[in-house]
């Protein structure tokens, strides 16, 4: 396959590119960075910084859109919210226009997030569950609406928190737990959807290979976990205390609106992936944590 990938130098993108190269696919990575990448060692990868650099005759079998300004890294000022929207909506619009100019339309796999559902307490969330009206939920809805304007097969990946020791949220919090500084966020009763990086990549490849798959897919492990249970499990595996509790008011004081990402409860189920026959390597967070810490 000939594949165009955005976000190819991020945590998910790099892992995906490695797998695509093992499959001997041809990969073109659209990136804002002009610096050399470790991925450039692969002979079947090329880098571009704008769609205009592509040959007008070049035909892609699939376009995978993973690009976007990191959602949690900076305070959500009015300007930052504009950047978060622009980095997703503008590029996705360009990609849709690029796809629709061809008679043979490539598969379009485009990013989204489980944040589209907002806080739903204990209720199980599937792809048909109601969406919310928060900033992140509206961002995801607008992002998906643009992607769905592409002709051909479109898959939307509503991603939970991606776990890996190579980067992302888990890699950032591990040192704090090793220092005995782990703890509950609020009451700790909130579910948070998570997915192992390995399953994230396998899921994208599954969508590529299964032409019957289309529409929105929850990319989260079958078993969401409550924050207090995650906290206790990780602390026990590391043999460290984790008695701290950060109250909701303090999280909101420190993080502002971003605190909602840590406090919303989302018991997400990957119903469509499971019904399509996808098998998760890591369905249970406790088993996943035990496995990665044993091999770290």
UniProtKB/Swiss-Prot annotation:
Coiled-coil region list: none
SUPFAM superfamilies in UniProt: NAD(P)-binding Rossmann-fold domains
Family annotation (Pfam families): DUF1731, Epimerase
Highest taxon in the source lineage: Bacteria
PANTHER family hit by this protein: EPIMERASE FAMILY PROTEIN SDR39U1, SUGAR NUCLEOTIDE EPIMERASE RELATED
Record-stated family: Belongs to the NAD(P)-dependent epimerase/dehydratase family. SDR39U1 subfamily.
Record-given protein name: Epimerase family protein HI_1208
Source species: Haemophilus influenzae (strain ATCC 51907 / DSM 11121 / KW20 / Rd)
């Amino acid at each position: 396959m000939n594949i165009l990938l955005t976000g190819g130098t991020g945590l998910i993108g790099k892992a995906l590119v490695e797998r695509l190269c093992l499959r001997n696919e041809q990969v073109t990575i659209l990136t804002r960075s002009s610096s050399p990448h470790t991925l450039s060692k692969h002979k079947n990868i090329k880098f571009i910084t704008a769609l205009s650099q592509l040959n007008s005759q070049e035909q892609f079998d699939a376009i995978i859109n993973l690009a976007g300004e990191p959602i949690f890294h900076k305070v959500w000022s009015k300007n930052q919210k504009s950047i978060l929207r622009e980095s997703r909506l503008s590029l996705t619009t360009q990609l849709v226009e690029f796809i629709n100019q061809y008679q043979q339309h490539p598969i379009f796999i485009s990013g989204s997030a489980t944040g589209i559902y907002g806080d739903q307490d204990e209720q199980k969330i599937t792809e048909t569950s109601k969406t919310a009206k928060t900033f992140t939920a509206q961002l995801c809805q607008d992002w998906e609406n643009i992607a769905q304007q592409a002709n051909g097969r479109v898959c939307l990946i509503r991603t939970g928190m991606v776990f890996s020791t190579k980067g992302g949220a888990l890699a950032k919090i591990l040192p704090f737990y090793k220092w005995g500084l782990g703890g509950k966020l609020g009451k700790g009763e909130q579910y948070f959807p998570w997915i192992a990086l390995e399953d994230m990549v396998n899921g994208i490849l599954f969508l590529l290979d299964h032409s019957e798959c289309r529409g929105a897919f929850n990319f989260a492990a079958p078993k969401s976990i409550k924050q207090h249970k995650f906290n206790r499990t990780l602390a026990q595996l590391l043999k460290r205390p984790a008695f701290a509790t950060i109250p909701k008011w303090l999280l909101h004081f420190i993080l502002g609106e971003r605190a909602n990402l840590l406090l919303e409860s989302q018991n997400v189920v990957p119903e469509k992936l499971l019904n399509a026959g996808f098998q998760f390597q890591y369905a249970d967070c406790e088993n996943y944590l035990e496995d990665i810490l044993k091999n770290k």
